[in-house]
């Protein structure tokens, strides 16, 4: 399968791509809720931040796909790239913490306690410091943790976003 076939498909159906990404993100969020409320897994602060990134991706992709204006596709793809890139970064950081857990728990407070107790400019950096909870692997599928699989999905969304951007920009240049 050549790159032109893929980009041609992207060019002919970008709204379908945005709809697919939005539905996939919603599906991942639903699965996260299932793991939390049915299986009983408690999300760590990094998991919650990844959920926020997925919500952003779902909203951006959904609104862009629902719009009939092709001019919005480039902006939507750029915003989707930023949101999914951020989510991939957080998932990669959590995966790294799982592979190389810190010797000492570096963040003892829970997410909501930090947000309620500290001003936002202090709470947000505390969230990204990670904790023993973030390094704990509670569930795996085919040898990958939730953070590993979330990174894979965010990576695929990043690639789709880049392909959409490249195709749109290359059409404007030529």
UniProtKB/Swiss-Prot annotation:
Query: Which parts of the sequence lie on the Cytoplasmic side of the lipid bilayer?
Result: 1-17, 68-74, 168-174
Which Pfam families is this protein grouped with? DsbB
Per UniProt, subcellular location reads as:
Cell inner membrane
A GO term, aspect molecular function: electron transfer activity
Q: What topology does the record note for this protein and the membrane? A: Multi-pass membrane protein
Annotated signal sequence range = none
Q: Tell me what this protein is called.
A: Disulfide bond formation protein B
What is this protein's gene name? dsbB
